[in-house]
Amino acid sequence: MSTNSTRTPLDHIRNFSIVAHIDHGKSTLADRLIQSTGGLAERDMSEQVLDSMDIERERGITIKAQTVRLHYKANNGETYVLNLIDTPGHVDFAYEVSRSLSACEGSLLVVDASQGVEAQTLANVYQAIDNNHELVTVLNKIDLPAAEPERIKEQIEEVIGIDASDAVMISAKTGLGIPDVLEAIVNRLPPPKSDVGENGPLKALLVDSWYDTYLGVMVLVRVIDGVLTKGQQIRMMGSGAKYGVERVGVLTPKMVNVDSLGPGEIGFITASIKEVADTRVGDTITDDKRPTAQALPGFKPAQPVVFCGLFPVDAADFEDLRAAVGKLRLNDASFSFEMESSAALGFGFRCGFLGLLHLEIIQERLEREFNLDLVATAPSVVYEMTLTDGTEKELHNPADMPDVVKIKEIREPWIKATILTPDEYLGGILKLCQDRRGLQTELTYVGNRAMITYELPLNEVVFDFYDRLKSISKGYASFDYNIIDYREGDLVKMSILVNGDPVDALSMLVHRSAADRRGRGMCEKLKELIPPHMFQIPIQAAIGGKVIARETVRALRKDVTAKCYGGDATRKRKLLDKQKEGKKRMRQFGKVEIPQEAFIAALKMNDE
């Protein structure tokens, strides 16, 4: 379906996003806004229209930013075009959030009236303020018996420092107060600005891109200056690639083709782009023949932060896994992978992710959408090394670590973590951060909740920090982080040896102070899981040549003297010595079978 769009004047456009913590009702509010402006017919409405992936709906999180264009007839009789960009709320997708926010001029800050401000709300609000957004505060879930709107308003003013006296009170579930939200968007959020209008050279921000089976890569753009039309030759300023625009349209949330997009408008284009990796979020799109002089600021390619190996449980599934990661890569440029082989687990891929949630989601999508059974090795972060000959090197896999003699220094990434928690759990959380080599930088109270800021090594967080935090605080603490810098650390490579052979999939880089604890835990876990063989199996954790922990799996033995009735003791001695000799030889040549479950359990080992 195609419409000939007459250009909407700038002062009748509002571009906004919704900023909220997980579960505070962001996607439900988006549904209500779509419904009340007639964006979708009743029969097409589904819960969380904008969360199109199953995982997004089930976990109640938004992963990919989505957009929708709504037409709203305001109380003053004018019709406005509202472009809502739905942003992910999770810390792993912080870069996506910052790009989505830079495409808008204002944000709705949605806070649950019963729960108050959470850590991720803070992180995203600060990003919105960095982008000079006008904020409209919306208190959601005011129909709940536990709602305390007045207390939460005070909390917003104390914690975030913005005036919440004129907050809009709504219940997105029942639809209460939705008209007030629409009026607030029109009256309180600013319209987009354009320096040169539609006659200047094209300048557009690439907000997002995804892969469509029929149309190839679809690119979501926000036009700043100039006009984007069908048939135009465009150029990506970050990569220098050129494309011909085949189709221009808007999402309402259905795709509707239009002839062109002008300043302030948000829509999509397709242009025979082969894969999503060619369209980098945050890049500037311009006309190839008449380019704009300056690209938009703030563009940086997404860098993977956490790495882990993914291996198929059944080696025969390797080709299916190769096809599956290739398909996911089409839709997610921040996910990277390369082939790797492990003596214990066979062939698989070393994959890079933006963070732990990203890793979990990719793994779940591979298992779910492609029916694969996978084993993931222990997650590791990217280390920077300076070698003795002066060269700089990045280390993604602990197994590739060069000889200690060649390393001058190793630097690891550090994060700044903000934790919000009810104060009764404060002691346990401080101890957890202390145990993980954290440096406390701030501790403030807001009512009965504490806000703690810590600097922590990312290496200590990727393992199971989040799970431990949730269990200490019974699920009440919220956590948000961003990477600040790389710092030198006393890091050592810990290898696990089974029967004298190193098991590559279990080697990891640890801080020297935590090596004992980690090594002992790993050996004890493996001792429980490796079944007894006919010979005794030593399990050791070693740093370089020094063994720091050891457990032994006892041998099974046959009673070889059972057939001797009485008689000479030397006869029994001879049989026992012969058995001992056999066991010795067996230990030399025997291979230890480590069951798959042992790997999975050892890698999931909780750092108690």
From Swiss-Prot:
Q: Write down the EC number.
A: 3.6.5.n1
Residues covered by the tr-type G domain: 11-193
Q: Name one GO molecular function term.
A: translation elongation factor activity
Q: Which UniProt keywords apply?
A: Cell inner membrane, Cell membrane, GTP-binding, Hydrolase, Membrane, Nucleotide-binding, Protein biosynthesis
One family from Pfam that matches here is: GTP_EFTU_D2
| Main location group | membrane
List the InterPro entries: EF-4, EFG_III/V, EFG_V-like, EFTu-like_2, G_TR_CS, LepA_C_sf, LepA_CTD, LepA_IV
Show the catalytic activity. Answer: GTP + H2O = GDP + phosphate + H(+)
Localization recorded for this chain is: Cell inner membrane
* Membrane-topology annotation of the record: Peripheral membrane protein
Please give an example of a GO cellular component term from this record: plasma membrane
Instruction: Tell me the residue numbers annotated for binding GTP.
Output: D23, H24, G25, K26, S27, T28, N140, K141, I142, D143
- UniProt cross-references to PROSITE patterns, sorted A to Z: G_TR_1, G_TR_2
- Which Gene3D superfamilies does this chain map to? 3.30.70.240, Elongation factor 4, C-terminal domain, Elongation Factor G (Translational Gtpase), domain 3, P-loop containing nucleotide triphosphate hydrolases, Translation factors
Kindly indicate whether the keyword Metal-binding belongs to this entry.
no
- Tell me which Gene Ontology terms the entry assigns under biological process: positive regulation of translation
What family, per the record?
Belongs to the TRAFAC class translation factor GTPase superfamily. Classic translation factor GTPase family. LepA subfamily.
The protein in question is named Elongation factor 4
Organism lineage string: Bacteria, Pseudomonadati, Pseudomonadota, Alphaproteobacteria, Hyphomicrobiales
